[in-house]
Amino acid sequence: MSIPDSSVVKAFLLELQNNICNGLEALDGVASFKEDSWKREEGGGGQSRVLTGGKVFEQAGVNFSHVMGASMPASATAHRPELAGRNFEAMGVSLVIHPNNPHIPTTHANVRFFIAHKEGTDPIWWFGGGFDLTPYYPYLEDVVSWHQSAKALCEPFGDETYPKYKKWCDEYFWLPHRNETRGVGGLFFDDLNKQGFDKSFDFMQAVGNGFLTAYAPIVERRKETEYGEHERQFQLYRRGRYVEFNLVYDRGTLFGLQTGGRTESILMSMPPLVRWEYAYIPEAGSPEAALYSDYLKPRDWLSL
């Protein structure tokens, strides 16, 4: 088995952050990212980049972080008790994009690497990540192209890879209290290490590099679509689901807060504007109703 090398992972993640920021700036055409570098007292730090007030993107955040500590937090050891008593190193790129136009979906992506050491034993390490799409208005073409891109990047890694990580994504981004998915899914993987460092790293890179390939065509198709106050209000209402998931269920958010991570960077995923409405029910036969009935549940999008 190849030896895990965190330095090559870090170099890739920094390059990925640059590439994604450059790609998003090109899509927006007006706004640019502002960088905020930070250090963590217990060890490590990161670079938070945020674009606000763009022509296409209301807010887009692309974070790189590399943190270390003497012991793993409860959020990490809960499902991996063998990590207790080990020092750790965690690094990743995480992004969330909230567009202005309700016809462009919100999206999230993350790729990460963990390694935990204890003197006299082999390190415990794994990769994780994925990307997912949260549309406000139902465009089957966009959802299918998103999943086609996800499947294509998985194909070199085996026929079972896409269905496995697609299913995991549907299960992870589920809001039990709403009985609905956060969006239309994509890929989600974690604890990836069984095939050795090199192959696992290859897959993580494929997911990171595949994100813009999947998302950019959707932005291009929808960015000139006209919308009014009704669509905007529905977008703001549905953004509430994003807030609910991230603050109640998301493991990455919990890990960051429990490890004393930088709060501004962790909560960068929050939409700049959001609204809740008591007992909202979409009008029968409307596009909003179609989102609820046809899109907020796990489906095999590539067989429709």
Swiss-Prot record:
<comment type="function">
    <text>Involved in the heme biosynthesis. Catalyzes the aerobic oxidative decarboxylation of propionate groups of rings A and B of coproporphyrinogen-III to yield the vinyl groups in protoporphyrinogen-IX.</text>
</comment>
<keyword id="KW-0560">Oxidoreductase</keyword>
<feature type="active site" description="Proton donor">
    <location>
        <position position="108"/>
    </location>
</feature>
<dbReference type="GO" id="GO:0005737">
    <property type="term" value="C:cytoplasm"/>
</dbReference>
<feature type="binding site">
    <location>
        <position position="98"/>
    </location>
    <ligand>
        <name>a divalent metal cation</name>
    </ligand>
</feature>
<comment type="subunit">
    <text>Homodimer.</text>
</comment>
<protein>
    <recommendedName>
        <fullName>Oxygen-dependent coproporphyrinogen-III oxidase</fullName>
        <ecNumber>1.3.3.3</ecNumber>
    </recommendedName>
</protein>
<feature type="site" description="Important for dimerization">
    <location>
        <position position="177"/>
    </location>
</feature>
<keyword id="KW-0350">Heme biosynthesis</keyword>
<dbReference type="Pfam" id="PF01218">
    <property type="entry name" value="Coprogen_oxidas"/>
</dbReference>
<dbReference type="GO" id="GO:0046872">
    <property type="term" value="F:metal ion binding"/>
</dbReference>
<dbReference type="InterPro" id="IPR018375">
    <property type="entry name" value="Coprogen_oxidase_CS"/>
</dbReference>
<feature type="binding site">
    <location>
        <begin position="110"/>
        <end position="112"/>
    </location>
    <ligand>
        <name>substrate</name>
    </ligand>
</feature>
<dbReference type="GO" id="GO:0042803">
    <property type="term" value="F:protein homodimerization activity"/>
</dbReference>
<feature type="binding site">
    <location>
        <position position="108"/>
    </location>
    <ligand>
        <name>a divalent metal cation</name>
    </ligand>
</feature>
<feature type="binding site">
    <location>
        <position position="147"/>
    </location>
    <ligand>
        <name>a divalent metal cation</name>
    </ligand>
</feature>
<feature type="binding site">
    <location>
        <position position="94"/>
    </location>
    <ligand>
        <name>substrate</name>
    </ligand>
</feature>
<keyword id="KW-0963">Cytoplasm</keyword>
<dbReference type="InterPro" id="IPR036406">
    <property type="entry name" value="Coprogen_oxidase_aer_sf"/>
</dbReference>
<feature type="region of interest" description="Important for dimerization">
    <location>
        <begin position="242"/>
        <end position="277"/>
    </location>
</feature>
<keyword id="KW-0627">Porphyrin biosynthesis</keyword>
<keyword id="KW-0479">Metal-binding</keyword>
<dbReference type="InterPro" id="IPR001260">
    <property type="entry name" value="Coprogen_oxidase_aer"/>
</dbReference>
<feature type="binding site">
    <location>
        <begin position="260"/>
        <end position="262"/>
    </location>
    <ligand>
        <name>substrate</name>
    </ligand>
</feature>
<comment type="similarity">
    <text>Belongs to the aerobic coproporphyrinogen-III oxidase family.</text>
</comment>
<feature type="binding site">
    <location>
        <position position="177"/>
    </location>
    <ligand>
        <name>a divalent metal cation</name>
    </ligand>
</feature>
<comment type="pathway">
    <text>Porphyrin-containing compound metabolism; protoporphyrin-IX biosynthesis; protoporphyrinogen-IX from coproporphyrinogen-III (O2 route): step 1/1.</text>
</comment>
<dbReference type="GO" id="GO:0006782">
    <property type="term" value="P:protoporphyrinogen IX biosynthetic process"/>
</dbReference>
<dbReference type="GO" id="GO:0004109">
    <property type="term" value="F:coproporphyrinogen oxidase activity"/>
</dbReference>
